[in-house]
Amino acid sequence: MLADVIYLFHMPLFVTISGAVYAIGKQSGKYQDFKSLLVNKVRRLLVPYYFVAYLFVVPTILGLAMNRFESNIDYFFLEILLGTNCRHLWYLWALFWMFIIVRFCKGRYLGNTIYCLIIAMILSVGCSYWVGTDWFSFRMALHYLPFFFLGEWLVIKDRNSMKMWKPVILVLLSGCILKLTDSKWMDSLFSLWMNVGIVVIVCLFIRKISVEKFFSHSFNILILRDSFGVYLFHVPIIYIMVSYLQNYPIYVLLPLVGVISIIGSLFFTMILRKMRLQCLMGE
């Protein structure tokens, strides 16, 4: 039950944060030139994607015989190279497309964030009817695009005018409609609205707590500083541990996997920095 609740909003929340970071960067003078944005996101997102995919994910998947293709070459080229089944790394390609789409739309056609948010919601709902292969995670980019614009909107929105009861009502209303309807497009629309409400509630809650106090703890500083490295490396470590320790009781396996995957990811991050290869992680 707890896992279901977390999975309901954790990716929308991450995308919203990415949109907020983009908005803050743009306010400080970044991303004014499309070419510089493109080069920056290739270096920050696609270089880590192919580095981690080929040196960590592919060997792990093939070594543990987890690939669904009969040929290892098919997995190596079709699924990883073209981003069709890239495990947790799909987020890098999706985020790359979101940066490009947002910069293109806001730079040339649509300056109003609300208009962009509405159009993104229409595209997101339309993605529920997407059939076929999701090349380079483009469908996932469209699916989560509203949350990127939401993050941008939350940055420019006057925080004093945002009341907690509004997103709470949105979540409750959306949940009720989801229970009462059996329409695919309505389910997609109100699932999206419910996620939007949950993300806004989380963001408003974070604003009310002492963020500075949270950031002052040394462990939190370490995790935040190396969070991208943890994201890149933790899944292959989890695959290996679960494969060899699957007979352990679940109450032992889960915390053990969680702790060791974080420590292992921090270790790989530190090694790459020591070797001056942090560029392979997008730094």
Model-derived features: positions:
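Residue-level signature of transmembrane alpha-helical entry/exit and packing/kink sites
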Residues: 4, 8, 36, 44-45, ...
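Solvent-exposed interhelical
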Residues: 99-121, 153-170
